[in-house]
Swiss-Prot record:
Residues 242-265 are annotated as: Disordered. InterPro entries: 14-3-3, 14-3-3_CS, 14-3-3_dom_sf, 14-3-3_domain. The keyword Cell inner membrane does not apply. It comes from the Eukaryota. It comes from Arabidopsis thaliana (Mouse-ear cress). This is 14-3-3-like protein GF14 nu. Is associated with a DNA binding complex that binds to the G box, a well-characterized cis-acting DNA regulatory element found in plant genes.
């Protein structure tokens, strides 16, 4: 290997194959911190995103499961169990906070300042919004309000650049619209805003689908499908307030089961 940077990238790939995502994060943090003026390559950027997405995703899933059990025990009046669950949930929340703080510090200190291309700026600002949103999912009171406000600022900054400089079919622009709409729906409880944003992004992409290059066709159409899935889910919720199905977020990999779809990339 010609440099420690290349070696850490290779180690990150090995860690990904071995599903050792905490170590993958460590290797990619080293890469990011060695880049003072240059940007990360697209491959490096994606590796960093995948590493953090997996590390945070496992804890987010754990938190949702524990919170669901807590609600059931509360409804049954099992106060002793509820007390134990609250302590255990607090342990998971400490881990979530540490992970989010780690990537947010890296974004503010290295990644956002060195981003010169519009694509990179949108990618990192979207990522910043995502991890503030993850904090808003479990924080309460003033901390939740602060996390939600930081999410909104990051997503809006990313959106301004995306609308000006990225095509409607660009997977990063689509992923931003997907996650921004999830934020409106889940965190701000604004289903109308969520549906409006998702529908506009989908419609604009559809109108330019014939301009889509082969290299991004798969990513873009996958996110468009997730946008459509969420619109279907949200419109049915608005109509009958049934709820219960999973919203989709943008992710490099398949969306998690049982939640709105969102993207990690």
């Amino acid at each position: 290997m010609s440099s420690s940077r290349e070696e850490n990238v290779y180690l990150a790939k090995l860690a990904e194959q071995a599903e050792r995502y905490e170590e993958m994060v460590e290797f990619m943090e080293k890469v990011a911190k060695t880049v003072d003026t240059d940007e990360l390559t697209v491959e490096e950027r994606n590796l960093l995103s995948v590493a953090y997405k997996n590390v945070i995703g496992a804890r987010r899933a754990s938190w949702r499961i524990i919170s669901s059990i807590e609600q059931k025990e509360e409804s049954r009046g099992n106060d002793d169990h509820v007390s134990i669950i609250k302590d255990y949930r607090g342990k998971i929340e400490t881990e979530l906070s540490k992970i989010c703080d780690g990537i947010l510090n890296l974004l503010d200190s290295h990644l956002v300042p060195t981003a010169s291309l519009a694509e990179s700026k949108v990618f990192y600002l979207k990522m910043k919004g995502d991890y503030h949103r993850y904090l808003a999912e479990f924080k309460t009171g003033a901390e939740r309000k602060e996390a939600a406000e930081s999410t909104l600022v990051a997503y809006k900054s990313a959106q301004d650049i995306a609308l000006a400089d990225l095509a409607p079919t660009h997977p990063i622009r689509l992923g931003l619209a997907l996650n921004f709409s999830v934020f409106y729906y889940e965190i701000l409880n604004s289903p109308d805003r969520a549906c409006s944003l998702a529908k506009q992004a989908f419609d604009e992409a559809i109108s330019e689908l014939d301009t889509l290059g082969e290299e991004s066709y798969k990513d873009s159409t996958l996110i468009m499908q997730l946008l459509r899935d969420n619109l279907t889910l949200w419109n049915s919720d608005i109509n009958d307030e049934a709820g219960g199905d999973e919203i989709k977020e943008a992710s490099k990999h398949e969306p998690e089961e049982g939640k709105p779809a969102e993207t990690g990339q």
